[in-house]
Amino acid sequence: MTLGFWIIKILATTLGETGGDSVTMSMNLGYAIGSFIFLGIFVVAIIAQIAGKRFHPILYWMTIVATTTLGTTMADYVDRSLGVGYFGGSSILLAGLVASLAVWRWSEGSISVNTVATPRVELFYWVAILFSQTLGTALGDWMADTNGLGYEGGAIVFAGALAVVAAACYCTAISRTLLFWAAFVLTRPLGATLGDLLDKPVSHGGLAISRYLASGILAALIVALILLIPQRAGVYPGGRIREEEEALEA
């Protein structure tokens, strides 16, 4: 993974927060309806992504954003509408992530993204990503809302944790697969707290920026970086996701 990949990933997770809140809060559609809307978008995106014979950067990142927006609304629904709270919601979602990775490993023998070379394995990949995004949202809300850290403090904590994972990648022999999934989960609460910092009212510790404006700016930044960062196409078979990682070279 390169720095360019992770910068776009953090922007995508932040967009997932502001975009999800735009539908559920600004449009006042609620968490359940918002989740159904984003579920539909996610299903369409993942079908197109898996059906593609080559790597399409815009499509790949659209699918990532679809998982972050759906993760936002699903986490809010589980935590708030179902009344299980942040701890209960995070526990349920963690169990879902572990189960999805366990089934993937049991079926294919590995959960490394370097093995994603068939549509079936790619489906495992996207299901695990969806659980990781939803879990990350719940963790971000839990940290910011219940520990007195606020959005800025929560963002600093998760940025620090992400830095530790990055250091471990260069300084230890810890499994790169484990570090990848740890980083993938941690970018989500970082983006969630940054998104809340942007659009929540000043009285709640935010900057009160319009959710629509924040989402538009974030989307524009993502598109600009996708176009600016050199990317190479991958073809089945041979590990399309792996080539997606290698393509994002800053």
Tell where the protein language model's regions lie, with residue ranges.
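Polytopic alpha-helical membrane proteins, predominantly small-molecule transporters/carriers
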Residues: M1-A250
